[in-house]
Amino acid sequence: MLSVAELTRGLSDLVEDRYDDVWVEGELSDFTRAASGHCYFSLKDEDAQIRCVMWKHLTQYVYFEPEEGMQVRVNGHASVYERRGDLQIQAQAMRQAGKGAQQKAFEELKQTLQAEGLFAPERKQALPAFPDTIGVVTSGQGAAIHDIQSGLARRFPPAEVVLCPVKVQGLDAPRAVADAVAAFNDLPADDAQRPDLLIVGRGGGSTEDLWAFNEEVVARALDASNLPVVSAVGHESDVTIADLVADERAATPSAAAERVVPDRRDVADRVRALHDRLRSRVTGRLQDARQRVDALVASRAFHAPARRLEQHRQHLDALVDRLGRGGARAVDRARTRLAHLRDRLHALDPEQPLRRGYVHLTQDGTSVQSAESLQDGDRVRLHFQDGRRDAEVLPDDG
């Protein structure tokens, strides 16, 4: 024989075990926001209805005003309210149902932000030409961070990547992305972790998967950023609110890596071209000075009587003195600039770290970025200055 409490408790356990995380779509009915801030409502269709409750701390993530009769999708877990024996859903998230409703929410937010000027070209920040540190806001486990790191290492090895791993889909994703952008901006200017720009994004997915980047909280965070932001959400055909607000949009995470840094080969070509241009300018100025002196010596004034000769000789001495000082300064400036360019080109040489005793670790031809990416027994290759050796990853003895 079971008591009523035992029966309802047993039913509650069965329901919670089977329906611990479900999405339910239905018509919103009897929506009430209590003085406590909790929301109570029902979901119904033609054949049934079920009561729902959403606690106050979760209601802040509902980015629309629920209305009677609205078609919605609710995520949560089913349970039995034991006092009355009622079946209910404890809701964790609510979305407007249907692509039409989702598109409507997108367009309404887009119009609001556009009216405020958040998409205006004059608000866009320019990207630095040679960033030293790049902040990345994305999942720490997805393909996006791998694509970004690989692209940066291939094009511009001196650039350092600082990752702030966040959820990129689900209820907590919009706030997590916004908080990460704000955290990067809050770093002191002298902090080595403070980046020169941000890449914010994720890999491809469905419209629902990418929806965090259509939320207003993310748009506001990108607009408030003092650091230039490049959005890299999904694939080329996906356009989100974040793409419209960001300073620049890249079609994919890989494209973002290519956009934010120059190719080291292009940098080397530019340094060589600048060297040649400076040398040509200095040579031209010296040649022009020689021609002016030769013309003066060949002129009639150079053969005039002694008094005029002395005057022109003094004038010539003054010209030669000015030319010497100016030419020396020009040569010194050119020499200093060439030394700076030579040092910059030297710093871009990927072999330099190896000459200082460092080792470059690869696996299947790809650079290894962290110990966590290796498993016991993995075969890796060690690149030294004077050769390379293969090795096997052994278990960590602690």
Swiss-Prot record:
Primary residence: cytoplasm
Cleaved signal peptide residues: none
Catalytic activity reported: Exonucleolytic cleavage in either 5'- to 3'- or 3'- to 5'-direction to yield nucleoside 5'-phosphates
Protein's UniProt name: Exodeoxyribonuclease 7 large subunit
Family that this chain belongs to: Belongs to the XseA family.
Keywords, sorted A to Z: Cytoplasm, Exonuclease, Hydrolase, Nuclease
GO biological process, one term: DNA catabolic process
Role, per record: Bidirectionally degrades single-stranded DNA into large acid-insoluble oligonucleotides, which are then degraded further into small acid-soluble oligonucleotides.
Upper lineage: Bacteria, Pseudomonadati, Rhodothermota, Rhodothermia, Rhodothermales
Any one GO molecular function term: exodeoxyribonuclease VII activity
Leading EC class: hydrolase
EC annotation from Swiss-Prot or TrEMBL: 3.1.11.6
GO cellular component entries: cytoplasm; exodeoxyribonuclease VII complex
Pfam families: Exonuc_VII_L, tRNA_anti_2
PANTHER family in the cross-refs: EXODEOXYRIBONUCLEASE 7 LARGE SUBUNIT
Organism of this sequence: Salinibacter ruber (strain DSM 13855 / M31)
Protein localization: Cytoplasm
Quaternary structure and partners: Heterooligomer composed of large and small subunits.
